[in-house]
Amino acid sequence: GYKARPHPRFPSHACLSVNDCVVHGTHDMTTAPLKEGDVFSIDIGVLHEGWIGDAAWTYAICGTDPQNLALMNAGKDCLAAGIKAMQPGRPLLDWARAVEDVAEKKAGFKLIRGLGGHGYGRTLHGPPFISNVIPKHSGEWSDAFTPFKTGMLVAVEPMLTVGTSSVRSEGRNWPLFSSDGSMSVHYEADVLITPEGPLNLTEGLFDLPDVVGT
């Protein structure tokens, strides 16, 4: 599994996060069968000819709970809006402004603070860090005014919950849960910045169904 300090090596081949698990769900926490009404995300990395892809998508099991579907739609909508804002020469902050406007101001949900996207390519994680929220103070996000540059490869990944912007963990274990136990979703796309604007290398994810297991 993937190794990132200070965490132990990730014990699974994919992150499987169910309901209030925002990210980094592991195989040993998802042993119970998924049931109607559950929401779960799959986050995987792929290595091909020395290059890495990193993407995540969220699904609902069988049921069509209105709040769950609204949360999922907000996740997809803010991802799409954020990608459109990733124009060469513009600051990374433009991404966060677009995402926050859709997810929080318009949809009324909460974005997780302190987690976000990242550069990638030959390695899974690299600079810059890409926050999903506008920083509250100058020291919260040092890369906020770093510009998007032609040739940049970035993985952007809004994480939303129904009720909180914070997460909790159990010791040094990988899974991160919404601190209030509320439902969460996670979407991640790989984007190449071109002279003409952002190119979503994972555009096909938007064609996936929201509800599975019916």
Regions picked out by a protein language model, each given a short descriptive name:
Residues G1-T214:
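Active-site neighborhoods and metal-handling regions in enzymes and metal-associated proteins
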